[in-house]
Amino acid sequence: MSRHWTIAVLGAGAWGTALALTMQRAGHGARLWARDQNLVREINNARSNSRYLPGVKIDPAVLATDDMAAALEGADCVLAAIPAQSLRSVLAVAGTALKAHIPVVLCAKGIERETGQLMSEAARQALPENPLAALSGPSFAADLARGLPTAVTVAAQDGALAADLAKKLSAPNLRCYSSDDLMGVELGGALKNVLAIAAGATSGAGLGASAVAAITTRGFVELRRIGAAFGARAETLMGLSGLGDLILTCNSPQSRNFAYGAALGRGERLDNLPLAEGVFTASIAARMVSERGLEAPIIETVNGMLNGGLTVHAAMQALLARPLKSE
């Protein structure tokens, strides 16, 4: 039987906290790093994370710290549950205390706004010597934290590393599949955020379940088209990190991206909402498809709604008015 690991989880938001709880349930030692000293005190003393994961009791075995070196000391693996736009800077700090052979699993889904890089590309520049992998799939933090069944994909360019990590990170309620298609897994996780905003906007505008289904399905066509252009495998995008995640996030207000889109569709003020990762990704994704001459009208429409003043109803009319074609 393989030995248990000490796992450092960077980021004590909902996802990081849920991952730390799950790793502890799997028998690993779990340390949780957070910037916020008040949050660290709440986790360690009240055994709760009321801001990000209300109603979930945190096991006393999960220890939180705001000291990066202490979080990483003796760690066998790092789970980086940092928002995509902050990942590079946090990993640069972690790199000063992290041994070069320790694997780092990227648990954020997005594209870096300033560079247009996927998470593994940004992480590679921050941590040039560490083995890198990505964890992605249809998963809500609240479900995972409460012990509900969840399945994800763990991907790395080294298939053996991915398989080993998938085995180690699996837990009683978390089934991890492995893949060596890192590009496909990362693209699926990043682009579904944009498509979920489209689905949410359609729902929020009261355009009906049929329209949401159409947006989701045609959005998946765009995801596969973009994936093929970047070398992702079709079967990866048909799996948990592509289609699976798309189905979940395009149909649930638990998704920040869907909820953001729904508020947009209802014409509500957006400045008080938690910023969804798809807001950052939309403009980058639109640029990616434009530079490669790809057809992605839904992604371009989301970018138009977020950055070009396009209304939801005008966007839907424009999509419906596109030339008819075979499916």
Curated annotation (Swiss-Prot):
GO terms for cellular component: cytosol. This is Glycerol-3-phosphate dehydrogenase [NAD(P)+]. The lineage of its organism: Bacteria, Pseudomonadati, Pseudomonadota, Alphaproteobacteria, Hyphomicrobiales. It is found in: Cytoplasm. Keywords: Cytoplasm, Lipid biosynthesis, Lipid metabolism, NAD, NADP, Nucleotide-binding, Oxidoreductase, Phospholipid biosynthesis, Phospholipid metabolism. Sn-glycerol 3-phosphate binds at K109, G137, S139, K192, D245, S255, R256, N257. GO terms for molecular function: glycerol-3-phosphate dehydrogenase [NAD(P)+] activity; NAD binding. The gene is gpsA. Belongs to the NAD-dependent glycerol-3-phosphate dehydrogenase family. Catalyzes the reduction of the glycolytic intermediate dihydroxyacetone phosphate (DHAP) to sn-glycerol 3-phosphate (G3P), the key precursor for phospholipid synthesis. InterPro entries: 6-PGluconate_DH-like_C_sf (IPR008927), 6PGD_dom2 (IPR013328), G3P_DH_NAD-dep (IPR006168), G3P_DH_NAD-dep_C (IPR006109), G3P_DH_NAD-dep_N (IPR011128), NAD(P)-bd_dom_sf (IPR036291). It catalyses: sn-glycerol 3-phosphate + NAD(+) = dihydroxyacetone phosphate + NADH + H(+); sn-glycerol 3-phosphate + NADP(+) = dihydroxyacetone phosphate + NADPH + H(+). NADPH binds at W15, R35, K109, A141, R256, L275, E277. The active site is at K192 (proton acceptor). Its EC number is 1.1.1.94. It is an enzyme of class 1 (oxidoreductase). GO terms for biological process: carbohydrate metabolic process; glycerol-3-phosphate biosynthetic process; glycerol-3-phosphate catabolic process; glycerophospholipid metabolic process; phospholipid biosynthetic process. Pathway: Membrane lipid metabolism; glycerophospholipid metabolism. It comes from Chelativorans sp. (strain BNC1).
